[in-house]
């Protein structure tokens, strides 16, 4: 049985597999990478590094949507 960890995704607590990457979570929860910036523990993540970031218990992930205006 895989060990589980808890993360907070856009303000909601989620239980995920311990060895999950940020990329896995983006795919599982269908976050549109083309339209958002990803923040991990209050820091913007370089999209080139998303596949190599392993998540830890209590990590906080936010998808920040771009809004046009003028």
Region spans (language model):
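Ubiquitin-like/PB1-type beta-grasp interaction modules and other compact soluble beta-rich domains
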Residues: 1-69
């Amino acid at each position: 049985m895989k060990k589980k960890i808890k993360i907070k995704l856009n303000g909601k607590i989620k239980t995920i597999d311990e060895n999950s990457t940020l990329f896995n979570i983006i795919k599982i929860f269908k976050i549109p990478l083309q339209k958002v910036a990803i923040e991990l523990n209050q820091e913007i993540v370089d999209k080139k590094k998303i596949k190599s970031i392993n998540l830890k218990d209590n990590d906080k992930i936010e998808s920040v949507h771009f809004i046009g205006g003028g």
